[in-house]
């Protein structure tokens, strides 16, 4: 089936916010709970909505921790955020080929926009679906379905690219083929367990997948 739309997760997929997220959690937990945590205690929850992760640390204090986390995260956002290799070049190619694009993230819209604008990526995306845009979030299908609705694209002609099991599960439950990135900070076996339709080792391989899907359609 020809691919006419590609949906992308944001953090860890097209921009690298791993250090920002880890530092934000370390600071927040130490401030409110009085002990230090390591990256290994945070990384397994990458990809899920922030309130849920904070509730894993404290059912009582998660709301005040949420404010602290967001304040720290916004303050140091630009310092600890980097763009993933070849992202801009591949997005430009997708644009040239007339393929619609969307960001589908569990992050708040304004902070997601900030990350895109920081690297001048916003011009490559037709749609942004953030935390506020759906009641249910990944791994539920709602964010993916919302993006497809806004793009006016059929699920059969879409791909969802992400770095976590939540991206794969959200895509599958929405009836969309999934692409897992091998540069995820999460263990490869964790992604493999969810059986994504494709794996890519770099962004350029995404174009090969799209081309392969187009060729399959022509052979039918």
Curated annotation (Swiss-Prot):
Q: Return the GO cellular component terms, semicolon-separated.
A: cytosol
EC no. given is 3.6.1.1
CDD domains to which the protein is assigned, alphabetical: HAD_PPase
Q: Which GO terms describe its biological process?
A: DNA repair
Active-site residues per Swiss-Prot or TrEMBL entry: 9
Q: Which domain of life is it from?
A: Bacteria
Sorted keywords for this record are:
Hydrolase, Magnesium
**One of the record's GO molecular function terms:** phosphoglycolate phosphatase activity
Question: Which reaction(s) does its UniProt entry say it catalyses?
Answer: diphosphate + H2O = 2 phosphate + H(+)
Report the enzyme's class at the first EC level.
hydrolase
Keyword Repressor recorded: no
InterPro entries registered for this protein in UniProt:
HAD-like_hydrolase_sf, HAD-like_sf, HAD-SF_hydro_IA, HAD_2, HAD_sf, PGP-like_dom2, Pyrophosphatase_Ppax
Cofactor annotation: Mg(2+)
Family recorded in the similarity comment: Belongs to the HAD-like hydrolase superfamily. PpaX family.
What protein name is recorded for this chain?
Answer: Putative pyrophosphatase PpaX
Gene name of this polypeptide: ppaX
